[in-house]
């Protein structure tokens, strides 16, 4: 069983690298299940639209996770209630529309995969306690009982919080990855009890930028230049960044984790 997890898709350049590469990668690596974080996929890098989500599904994505930008496009409020494959962080207010986790079949209907979307509490917009939410979900998505495999996308700023969640799910989830900071970390590994982990899997976007945004305009904003405009995504060649987890069908835990970085400035 192979699961592909890709980092935040950033604006048009990020969508383009997905469109040009995802189907080929799924075939090349014999991927069974694909999860991407789509919360920056809109043209301005903030939020996601119905049409973009549906493009991702047609390109082979099984589940789209998100984070603090999930509500930036108003149309998504209605759509997320209708489309169970689009997740918002589970620890948003209880009354929030949509779901923060779900159970999905692989394309061949052979396996059930649990996908959990969480958002950090530190330096992020106010949410419910992420560990309390995680505790409740652990009682609902149980490896080798109601799912064959499970993965967690933890959308957060702080390395320590991400690492703590990784250890909290160690042995009870196939993999835990961090998103949000848009730069892939070098700590790709399998934890003590068998859970694949990486603090941040980066972004699918133009790295010749400031975390995906146009670098010239970003510098103007840092320098308080009156000519600076609102942030907008960089438009150069994008890098596709994520990981592939190879999992044991008997235990549901990770056997191997491989970093996947292709295209754009990170590979040149």
What are the residue ranges of the model-derived segments?
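Acidic, metal/ion-coordinating pockets
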Residues: 1-268
């Amino acid at each position: 069983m192979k699961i592909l997890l890709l980092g935040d898709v950033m604006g048009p350049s990020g969508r383009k690298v997905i469109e040009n590469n995802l189907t080929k990668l799924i075939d090349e690596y014999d991927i069974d299940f694909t999860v991407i974080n789509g919360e920056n996929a809109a043209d301005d890098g903030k939020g996601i639209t119905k049409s973009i989500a549906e493009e991702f599904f047609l390109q082979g994505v099984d589940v789209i996770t998100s984070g603090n930008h999930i509500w930036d496009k108003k149309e998504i409020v209605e759509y997320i209630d209708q489309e169970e494959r689009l997740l918002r962080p589970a620890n948003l207010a209880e009354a929030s529309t949509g779901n923060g986790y779900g159970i999905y079949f692989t394309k061949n209907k052979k396996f059930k995969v649990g996908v959990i979307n969480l958002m950090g509490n530190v330096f992020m917009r106010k949410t419910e306690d992420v560990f309390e939410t995680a505790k409740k979900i652990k009682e609902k998505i149980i490896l080798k009982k109601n799912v064959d495999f499970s993965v967690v996308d933890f959308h957060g700023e702080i390395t320590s919080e991400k690492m703590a969640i990784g250890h909290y799910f160690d042995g009870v989830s196939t993999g835990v990855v961090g998103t949000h900071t848009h730069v892939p970390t070098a700590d790709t590994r399998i934890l003590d009890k068998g859970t694949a982990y990486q603090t941040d899997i980066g972004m699918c976007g133009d790295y010749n930028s400031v975390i995906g945004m146009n670098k010239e305009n970003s510098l103007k904003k840092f320098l308080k230049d009156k000519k600076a405009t609102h942030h907008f995504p960089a438009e150069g060649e994008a890098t596709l960044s994520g990981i592939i987890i190879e999992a044991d069908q008997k235990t549901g835990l990770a056997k191997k984790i491989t970093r996947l970085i292709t295209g754009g400035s990170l590979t040149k």
